[in-house]
């Protein structure tokens, strides 16, 4: 049977992947970072602040582009590609066959989060899945920013603080990770659609950033 604390964590992660209420996530208990995970926890907190600030600015700047959580069509670009919620199950849940992650993830081996040398396989799997999530979002945001820079109106660009925060957490997770390639665009940019897409991605990424931060906090306390 799955322990109560682990079930609570699982319910929290699933909840955060479907709802866009940061205040609810903040009401969850915050844990103290252990030495091995402190750097990644710090980076995840920086990322959460950066994406929240970027989303707030986008909602203000793009107020006529249906940029609120209630107006957008929610989309998860990691769907069917990564499985972070399942990969980040606590060990006592992961040993239950019904709780195992169902997708394959390339394992990271050289991240500073793994510096202790005692990191379990399940923790490595969780951090690897988080790294893959960040890589996908980083590539999407870079491609989107390239289009926004071509907009004659120069209305909005992505906050470099957010892109740096993503890159720093990726570096901490996998110091030998490959450089994230630019995603080429073969079509003429539609700036209206690009700005709507920006809102969709920022909402989705904030939810993921909350999930990552909660997970780092949990791992730090384990």
From Swiss-Prot:
Signal peptide: 1-25
Subcellular location: Secreted
InterPro entries: 4_helix_cytokine-like_core (IPR009079), IL-12 (IPR050676), IL-12_alpha (IPR004281)
S-S bonds: 40-113, 67-199, 88-126
GO molecular function ontology, one term from the record: growth factor activity
GO cellular component: extracellular space
Homology family: Belongs to the IL-6 superfamily.
Identification of the protein by name: Interleukin-12 subunit alpha
Gene, per the UniProt record: IL12A
């Amino acid at each position: 049977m799955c322990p109560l604390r682990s079930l609570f964590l699982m319910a929290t992660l699933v909840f955060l992947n479907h709802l866009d209420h940061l205040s609810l996530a903040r009401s969850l208990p915050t844990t103290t970072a252990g030495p091995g995970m402190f750097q990644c926890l710090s980076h995840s907190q920086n990322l959460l602040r950066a994406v929240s600030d970027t989303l707030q600015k986008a909602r203000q700047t793009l107020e006529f582009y249906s940029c609120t959580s209630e107006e957008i069509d929610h989309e998860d670009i990691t769907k069917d590609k990564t499985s972070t919620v399942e990969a980040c199950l606590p060990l006592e849940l992961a040993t239950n066959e019904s709780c195992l992650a169902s997708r394959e993830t390339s394992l990271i081996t050289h991240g500073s989060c793994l510096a202790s040398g005692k990191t379990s396989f399940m923790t490595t799997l969780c951090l690897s899945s988080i790294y893959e999530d960040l890589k996908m979002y980083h590539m999407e945001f870079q491609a989107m920013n390239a289009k926004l820079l071509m907009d004659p109106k120069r209305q909005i660009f992505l906050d470099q603080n957010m892109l740096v925060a993503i890159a720093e957490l990726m570096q901490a997770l996998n110091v030998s990770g490959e450089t994230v390639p630019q995603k080429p665009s073969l079509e003429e940019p539609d700036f209206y659609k690009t700005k709507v897409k920006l809102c969709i991605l920022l909402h989705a990424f904030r939810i993921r950033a909350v999930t990552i931060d909660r997970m780092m906090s949990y791992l730090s306390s384990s």
